[in-house]
Design a protein with these regions (language model features):
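Long, low-complexity, intrinsically disordered segments
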Residues: 304-310
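Carbohydrate-binding/catalytic loop surfaces
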Residues: 20-42, 85-108, 151-176, 219-246, ...
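Well-ordered alpha-helical scaffold segments within catalytic/enzyme domains
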Residues: 49-67, 113-129, 181-196, 243-260
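Active-site/pore-lining binding-face segments in mid-to-C-terminal subdomains
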Residues: 169-235
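Long, contiguous hydrophobic alpha-helical segments, chiefly transmembrane helices and signal peptides
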Residues: 107-116, 138, 142, 151-165, ...
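Long, well-ordered core segments of solenoidal/helical folds
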Residues: 4-41, 66-89, 129-156, 197-223, ...
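A structural/positional concept
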Residues: 38-63, 71, 86-125
Length: 310
């Protein structure tokens, strides 16, 4: 428990502290609305409602404390969603508001992806009924976005799925590499689980889009651009570790389904890892273990090992 308290203090932005009957509340970024003049706004962050780190520690230690946190997490996720089909973000991001005039509620693809995986990977172990359904529902949502217009075409049948789906506004948003990879990985997992070709077809459309524009995504310093806009321009600094974790997961999934994509993914893994090494930004435990799993440990970035991706 002492180690958990120390870890929570060191990673205070990614650990829950204030639990309520409505779910965990955390200090919100000042780029969210509503926000009081003091800047001391508190709310529910969907990525923190699910207790990923507690799940890892429970699997390692089988500690009752972490088990309780996970049960609590499933209850909070159910209460948050209520009778809706998906988990909707309930606060406005001024970043999205300034770019696209999007206000809450909206669907964040990364949030729903991570929640679907939380249910899929651990729900059955905790007695959650139909624990695979969030995976199916979210994969179906991704497949439907081309028909709804929430995509960025590349060529032929290749495209990226937009990051955000507004509930009220009718606008197409950008597609960031981490969201693109996360969505593709969900589709591949859904294909493996349910053997429905529509999931594989959508995943191929995304992977071939990345292959077509690989050179545009990779920056001169080896890093990857954060996102592509509906106008096809590339902007923004990428996350330090998160996208590399996603690339490794993509490699693992395509390895068993269609290995023809592996050279492309290895090139992107090598480029991103080289950038991290040059900047001495280190790596996460997921990156280290993932590279070992796919036999590419030679790309492990230089620097310190970290628990949480930056």
């Amino acid at each position: 428990m002492e180690n958990w308290l120390l870890e929570s203090a060191q990673n205070y932005k990614k650990r829950n502290k204030w639990y309520t009957a409505s779910g965990p509340f955390n200090k919100m970024a000042t780029t969210t609305e509503p926000m009081p003049e003091t800047g001391q706004g508190y709310g529910r962050n969907l990525l923190l409602v699910k207790e990923d780190r507690a799940l890892v520690l429970y699997n390692q230690q089988k500690d009752r404390y972490f088990e309780n946190l996970i049960y609590n997490s499933f209850v909070n996720l159910k209460n948050f969603k209520e009778d809706k089909t998906y988990w909707e973000t309930e606060v406005t991001s001024t970043y999205l508001k300034d770019l696209y005039e999007i206000t809450a509620p909206f669907i964040d693809t990364r949030f729903n992806e991570q929640i679907a995986l939380f249910y899929y990977n651990s729900g059955a172990d905790f007695g959650i009924e139909n624990a695979k359904e969030p995976l199916r529902n979210y994969a179906d949502l991704l497949v439907s976005q081309k028909e709804k217009g929430n995509f960025i075409p590349v060529n032929g049948g290749s495209y990226y799925i937009s990051d955000y789906f507004p509930i009220v506004q009718d606008v197409k948003t950008h597609a960031s590499m981490n969201h693109v990879l996360g969505g593709m990985n969900i589709l591949l997992i859904a294909y493996n689980e349910f053997q429905d070709e529509k999931y594989l077809d959508a995943a191929r459309a995304i992977q071939t889009a990345i292959a077509t524009e690989k050179q545009d995504w990779i920056r001169d310093n080896g890093d990857i651009w954060y996102r592509i806009s509906p106008l096809h321009d590339y902007k923004g600094d990428d996350y330090k570790h998160l996208t590399l974790e996603d690339l490794i997961n993509s490699y693992k999934l395509w390895q068993d389904i269609d290995p023809t994509y592996l050279p492309l993914l290895e090139e992107m893994i090598a480029s991103k890892a080289s950038y991290l090494s040059n900047e001495n930004l280190g790596y996460t435990t997921k990156i280290k273990n993932g590279l070992q799993d796919i036999g590419l440990s030679q790309y492990l970035p230089k620097g310190k090992e970290q628990t949480d991706a930056l």
